[in-house]
């Protein structure tokens, strides 16, 4: 019985092969299921670690990024705006751009300062610059020279300077002339009436003379030196300065140098005759110069010296494309000089693309008013201005300059003054060349007491002994105001500038004027003193960024974010793009 029970206990149920296989397969599947579940969980954990939610990411970023103050944010915004504005096509010729030519070293000249000046230590040089209030930037800057004799000019040039009453160089000449004579590219910033013209005219004559003595210019060749000016009047004035120094050199036995005034309003045939004989020096306005180059009447193959006078006007929107076209015609490296009383950061950044290792010579802040001018600002109602003008003319003896924003005001004032028996002449862009020349020559000669003009006469024109400048209206741009009042107080003489303001002027313009008066230590009228001034709060931004006022136009009463000039130019660009898009002329092109 027991043996039967043992057998029953040890009995193993028979499982068929098919069933065993099915059980084994089921176990395998179960194991796989568990493994896949574990893998899924592991993958989920990995994903959770690798990809946090956007909210988590944003929180982490905020935590990781250091806090930026409001001041730093404004500085970054302004920096981006300036980079965007300066990101334009460089001032290089088509050939240079096509071949990828970049000049890394300035042009060499044979000029060297005397040994005793070369031996001056850097401390001695800096001391001279400090005494003359000269600020320089750049590498390997030539030393300042305090007299014309040490600059090694020929005797006829020195005699002509003496005849003109120029015995000692002005601050811009002390540093600017050695820089240019050494062959360096330069940005010259100095207030009007500081002697900028001689700084680029004298070295150009020396270079032309040197080239002529080495290899005389053949018929149809030239120019060697080119000066570009924004207005016909300024070009004519510069040309006259060139002629004043060229004539004595010829009389002293030096090779003759031919110079050409290349401006509109003059018959092109007479200009072409000079070019055909071979020309050394050309003083031009952008329009006529561009025309002659495009028609292949003149070439810049031999040109090695270029000056942009009143560069802020030339490189600005008005003449920017014309200047680019002029640069397209250069065949080799040239020495490039930019001069102006106002040189905003925007223009400096843009212009540096054309310069090789430039030296910046700054005599007084760019855009600062001449300290020899007494500035008087008066609140005058619009309807009372023309009558009050007669009272203002009594402040000083003639000659007096009156500036207006628009041509109609110039004509009205001119007519009113003639009716009142005042010897007056007028110029503006609407008058023909003959009238403009008569007005300027008779005023310069002292035959007329008053010149009424638009801003065409404010850009660099040199009228001797101007006692008084009257701004019939405040210009929209503060740099135009600086140019206007710079017609008086020249060469160390004191002058008066009277400006009429009223509610027609924008607050931004008046704030710029207020800060300019403060900088020049002038009396602030109550109407300006009462203005709500946001720049008082913006002082920390100015200190942090190193830029005082607007980096675009140079105005002290606002920052670049509120610049009226920039806003105006943006709106002009938008309207121009609309014209291009919709068509503004030709077949089916009229709006």
UniProtKB/Swiss-Prot annotation:
GO biological process: mRNA splicing, via spliceosome
EC top class named in words: hydrolase
Motif placement: DEAD box: 309-312
Top-level lineage group: Eukaryota
Motif (Q motif): 146-174
Family named by the database record: Belongs to the DEAD box helicase family. DDX41 subfamily.
Entry comment, domain topic: The Q motif is unique to and characteristic of the DEAD box family of RNA helicases and controls ATP binding and hydrolysis.
Protein name (database record): DEAD-box ATP-dependent RNA helicase 35
